[in-house]
């Protein structure tokens, strides 16, 4: 994880955008399984390391949230207490070499992020769903991403559990 954090920061530093990522809290780290079998193995592997794990069907796949007992070391981004474990979309395979698909940085206002990225001509895309809005920046040739999000995965998960949309595993 520290190597990924450094690569993410170097990407933004190379565009003169270090101020975008300095001191931003990492909301969570997301890993994508190669297939359903590996996804299930990840759940079994991480379950003993959590205070709570839940999952939610998202279309034809499942996405789990693991609340870790001991935070992950995210290098210069600090500690991360949430891990998102994603089953790949049908027909898709994970392309990342070290299992990390993306990290999400929590920001109260996405407008300064989009303005700074536009000003430096950094390619990004917007991701909007019922849970949150995110600015997504691909940082390397493996398709790994940094996402700036306006809502915490913990808050999203709490809402989904309360509504019965997500189920607790532990």
Residue ranges and their predicted role:
Residues 1-27, 31-57, 67-170:
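Glyoxalase I/VOC metalloenzyme domain signal
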Residues 62-65:
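A binding-site-centric feature that preferentially detects glycan-recognition modules on secreted/surface proteins
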């Amino acid at each position: 994880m520290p190597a990924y954090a450094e690569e993410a920061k170097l990407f933004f530093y190379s565009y003169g955008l270090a101020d975008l990522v300095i001191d931003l809290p990492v909301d969570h780290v997301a890993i994508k399984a190669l297939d359903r079998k590996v996804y299930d193995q990840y759940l079994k592997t991480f379950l003993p390391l959590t205070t709570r794990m839940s999952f939610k069907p998202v279309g034809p796949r499942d996405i789990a949230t693991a609340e870790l007992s001991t935070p992950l070391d995210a290098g210069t981004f600090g500690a991360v207490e949430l891990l998102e474990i994603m089953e790949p979309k049908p027909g898709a395979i994970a392309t990342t070499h070290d299992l990390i698909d993306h990290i999400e940085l929590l920001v109260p206002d996405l407008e300064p992020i989009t303005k700074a990225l536009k000003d430096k001509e950094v390619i990004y895309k917007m991701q909007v769903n019922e849970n949150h809005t995110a600015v997504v920046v691909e940082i390397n040739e493996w398709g790994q991403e940094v996402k700036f999000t306006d809502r915490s995965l913990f808050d999203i998960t709490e809402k989904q559990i309360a509504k019965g949309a997500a189920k607790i595993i532990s």
